[in-house]
Design a protein with these regions (language model features):
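Conserved beta-hairpin
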Residues: 12-23
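Conserved beta-strand in the GNAT
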Residues: 21-29, 36
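Conserved N-terminal entry element of GNAT/NAT acetyltransferase domains
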Residues: 1-7
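C-terminal structural segments of small proteins and small subunits
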Residues: 61-95
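Conserved acetyl-CoA-binding loop-helix of GNAT-fold acetyltransferases
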Residues: 48-59
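General beta-strand recognition
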Residues: 15, 34-36
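A short, internal acetyl-CoA/4′-phosphopantetheine-binding micro-motif in the GNAT/acyltransferase core
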Residues: 41-47
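Structural motif
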Residues: 8-10, 31
Length: 95
């Protein structure tokens, strides 16, 4: 089963969940119309299962849906965007 990705703005993060279990998270700060991604982590038991990719894709899809820009300070988010050029348009040009 593919995890669901949910924005948890009060915690400043997107979570990948399987029911009540958090499989991964990507932390962010909002700065105006920019979402600054600062850190991503995946539960060790879920590593290598695609949770990180599902998480970043879901977070960036949400950024796009809200007309925002992404600032990938997190190396995982940055490398994911580099491997998925169809998301490169979301990256704030000042980064």
């Amino acid at each position: 089963m593919e995890p669901t990705v949910k924005d948890v703005p009060e915690a400043g993060r997107y979570e990948a969940r399987d029911g009540d279990r958090v499989l991964g998270l990507t932390a962010y700060r909002r700065q105006g119309d920019r979402v600054v991604f600062t850190h991503t982590e995946v539960d060790p038991d879920a590593e290598g299962t695609g949770v990180g990719s599902t998480l970043v894709r879901g977070a960036l899809d949400d950024v796009r849906a809200h007309g925002l820009r992404a600032v990938p300070h997190c190396s995982f988010v940055r490398s994911w965007i580099d491997r998925h050029p169809d998301y490169a348009d979301l990256v704030d040009p000042s980064t």
